[in-house]
Amino acid sequence: IRETEDSVITAEGLIAICEQAHNMLDSITEGFRRQPAHRCPIGRAKGRLRVYQTIPPELLHPEMFIPAATLLGLLLGSFYNVCIHRYVSGESILFPPSHCPHCNQRLRFWELIPVLSYLLLRGQCARCHKPIHIRYPLVELLSGLTSGLLAWRFGPTLAFPVYLVFTGMLIVASGIDLECFILPDGITLGGPVLAVPAAIFALGMDWTDALLGGLVGGGTFLAVLLVFKRLRGVDGMGFGDVKLMLMLGVLCGPLGLPLITLVAGVSALAAFLLIACLMPREAPLREMPIPFGPFLSLGAFVHILAGQEILDWWIRFITG
């Protein structure tokens, strides 16, 4: 699907998002204070989140699984780069074969080795000597790192390939968002369709949690968008972010949304302040657009990797 939506957020929009995350956390906290532990919705969801259908461990040793997963992530990173570049340029993902974007010469196999080829070629094309975009090794390294961390976190379970696929979708969406402030509908609309059966059958989540997460995630961001537009007369964020939160809500459930939103808001605000200090602009800083998709993706990955531990710590903190 080629149709796209803007994915930008302003400083005022970031503040609104952080306030919304704080309110969501307050609501969860109040629920714990009013209910016995055995009746808490978080306590019930905690058990469901850990129900994974595992592959027999004898088939794959952990000490081999993590390096293999990291290598797989590096290889997938090359494909993610193709998706990002060709989406932005409007080319087909399948044809033509991999080539230099400057001289259009087809790349040989030794020029396609993740990260290593970039280092051996010293960051430039072997024929025309034009620079290779730094995005290529960074995306490959990021993909390898996230794949290795997922393998370490989940091991050889059904959760690993599920989260690997969706992490790859988030990497591609973030790369596109950083380049042109757009989140593709193929990911933001196709993702929820895939996330529903994945969450229910592979991750052991109740279908009510998956649907409720999507409704709360997308609905909350849509409400912020509409209220901000009504009060300020401008868009505080792009509609692509609303659709991305729909996907993340389905995949992570309603209890993952406060952490995702908080991490995204705080990290985006920190990036905004850093950019404001390093790159002075003539336009008002509060109107400076920031691609929000990468920060939502970061929040989702933090939840996937350590959300249960953070949730357990938060429960102990608020219940004494």
Give the ranges of each region predicted by the language model.
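Short terminal hydrophobic/aromatic SLiMs and anchors at protein ends
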Residues: 6-10, 22-28, 36-41, 47
